[in-house]
Every structure is written in structure tokens, then in C-alpha cells.
Amino acid sequence: MLILMRKNNTLFLLFAFCLFINTSAKGQTVQMLEQIGHLLDDAIFYSDRYITPATDVAVYQASSNWVTTPKKKKLWETSLSFHTNAFFVPKSDRKFTINNSDFSFFTIENASTAIVPTALGNNTQVWLVGQLDDGQNQTQVRVKAANGINQETVIYPYLQASLGLWHGTELVAKYSTNVKLKKCHYQVYGIGLKHNFSQYFKKIEAKNIYFSGLISYSKEDITFNFLDAQTDYGNLGLNEITGLVDTWQFQINASKQWKRFELMSALISNTSDFKYEVGGPKGQIEDLIPFQSLVNKKLEEIYKTKTNWIGELSGRYQISKIYVQTSVAFGKFVNSNFSIQYEF
């Protein structure tokens, strides 16, 4: 039933856009429209399997080290820190298996099954082929399966700042420019509010034990090189695929301090909304049908919402007004974070 609904949605989109097709496309056959519909379905299937592991990773990277210490900041006390995330990519998320039975338009060239990389995987030499027939001519669509970033560890930097407000509340913000990693671009920015609760328990704070809560919002954008699909109608406009992730996070932190060293733990819960879009140069096929727009409309079918529970451990050492901290977040994945902080 779900497959039937997806095919019906595709045909409806094609019919709606056909109302605007110019005169050069009036000779299109119903057969070609059905083929384009199958091509769209295959593009959505492949996109989902390819980029989902990477957007899951982005959530872990954005969730790390929001709280550098649960201790209460004085009013207007400020800190600025430089962070570096290091994410270790599991082998299971670096590849996936495709079969000819997964596709309605493409077939795997010279094979019935193949292992191809996700966005986090390595390079591949697998090709997908299909035929478009407009009733007069046939054109081959031959696409090389997308390569991954070919890295077992994904590293990226960002800046974070915090400002002490009233009654033990703290404003926290993190930001990175559009960082170019190997074969992809990544950007994260977010804002949060932390509140210190141990201030209400003086006997506990007297033992150098502190705890706090934080609520935050972050946005992660991650873009990968995707499918360079060349046809007689030009490029299909699938050269890039972007994952757009919006995350709300709540966490509680507790720490114990021994002189200059502070050991901290955290329990994190976050909920993320995932959206996707493709981009790239548009070819002559756009004169026949707005293919890229159709793909992006179809990608709405794989929008999703996920909730994660993450644990975090960290150690922080003070050197005058400078702090050095390392942390490890763990759950489905493992992400480490190293930071240098300066308190004004």
C-alpha cells in the first residue's frame, strides 16, 4: 500500500507539472512520464540510504560539550572556547547493500547486487544504468554510485561562548562557519540556556559537587557531493545532497571538583527533525520537466524525526584563566570533543 501511495504521489506531481510544460515537450509519451516517475522513486530510495547515517552523526557532533561546567557563573562573567569534535565512524554505517529489486528504473551495471558507500563511506566503482524513451529516441541514464568522504574519523572545529545572567542562569551559544571537510561542507550553530541547581543546596556545594540543567536549540547543515547524472538532456541536478537538521536538546550535568581538576557527567536527550534537498547545475531536462524541484518535493517523503539518549563524560583542568577539557559522548555512536576555554 505504501509503495502504491508513493507511485500515485509521483504521478500526481508529474501530471501537475505537465500542465506547465512548454511546446517542445508536448510530444512526451505517457511511458516517458512513468519512467521519470520511477527515476524519482529510485533517487529518493538511494538518497535516504546514502545520507541518513551522516545526519545521525551530525546530531551527535552538535550535542557534545554544551556545558563545560555545571558551576554557577557570576553575573556578566564570560567565557570563550575553541572546540574540536572527533567522530569515529562505525563500519556498519559506512556502506549498504543494493539489489536490482530495490529499483524500478535503474539496474546495477553488470551485477544484480552491490555494496555501495554511504556519505560516511569510501569510494566506489559501481554504476547504475537506465533508459528514458520519449517515443522517438532512447537516451541512457548512467550514474556512478556516490562516493563517501572516505574517512574513519570526522573532525571539525567550532567556537562556543557563554555569558552569566541572573540567578545562576547562563546563555550559551555555539557557531561554526561553513567548514569544508573532505568531499563535504558542514555548519552548525545554536543557542541554549543553562541553570545551576546546586546553588540551592549549600551543603552539597560545600563538598565541591555541582549540578545543572540545560535546554538548547541547534541547526546542523551538512552537504555532500552526490550523483553526477549526465544524460542527453543534460545534467539532472543531483550533484549535491544536503541534510538539514533541527535539534532540541535537554540535559542534566553533575560534577565533582578536586582543586584544579573537575570531573563531569551528563545525561542528554534530544529530538531532531531531518529534512533533505538536492542541488547542482540544472540541465536541459528542466525544459521538459522541473526535475530538481520534483526530487526535492519527493524528498519530503523521507523527512523524519528521531530522539536520542546520549551519555557524556568529561574532565576539565584549570591553568589560571585557561581551561583544558576533553569529553566523550556515547550512545549509538561515540564522539569525542577537545576544547580550550578562556574565562574573562
Stretch-by-stretch model annotation:
Residues 167-171, 200-203, 260-263, 321-326, ...:
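Repeated loop/turn-to-beta-strand initiation elements of outer-membrane beta-barrel proteins
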Residues 74-76, 152-157, 185-191, 207, ...:
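Residues that define the transmembrane beta-barrel architecture of outer-membrane proteins
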Residues 28-166, 219-239, 273-303:
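A subset of solvent-exposed loop/turn segments in beta-rich extracellular surface proteins, enriched
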Residues 84-88, 175-179, 197, 215-221, ...:
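Transmembrane beta-strands of outer-membrane beta-barrel pores
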Residues 69, 80-82, 159-165, 191-197, ...:
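Residues on the lipid-exposed face of transmembrane beta-strands in outer-membrane beta-barrel proteins
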Residues 204, 210-253, 257-259:
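Outer-membrane beta-barrel translocator/channel fold
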Residues 1-32:
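Bacterial Sec-dependent N-terminal signal peptides
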Residues 68-76, 91, 183, 198-211, ...:
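Short loop/turn motifs that connect adjacent beta-strands in outer-membrane beta-barrel proteins
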